[in-house]
Regions:
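Coiled-coil dimerization/phosphotransfer module
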Residues: 1-107
Length: 107
């Protein structure tokens, strides 16, 4: 089961929208493939600071985070857009992927 929660009042810069999409896709795929999660919650919210926050939380097995090609690509994309990506795990409560991006891509 995947639950999507959004709180956005406006559209996103196309580069930011792609980064949001890819982070959600990677987070959900990893939760199901590696964590064997039964429930995944995806939250996309706009902060008062003008940042976009993306959280992907799962109830999978958790464990050590081993960055592969997908997570490394997300990290680079976030940094190139002036944002940051963090991933945490506290077994056995699953994994929390958090992406913070500016509303508009950095030129």
């Amino acid at each position: 089961q995947v639950v999507l929660e959004t709180q956005l009042s406006a559209g996103l810069d196309p580069d930011v929208a792609v980064a949001v999409y890819r982070s959600v896709a990677e987070g959900v795929a990893n939760a199901l493939r590696h964590g064997r999660a039964e429930h995944v919650t995806v939250r996309v919210t706009a902060a008062d600071s003008g940042a976009i926050h993306v959280d992907v939380l799962d109830d999978g097995a958790g464990g050590p985070i081993v960055p592969g090609v997908g997570l490394s690509s997300l990290q680079r994309r976030a940094e190139n857009l002036g944002g940051r990506l963090s991933i945490g795990s506290n077994p056995p409560t699953g994994v929390h992927l958090h992406l913070e991006l500016p509303t508009e891509a950095v030129a």
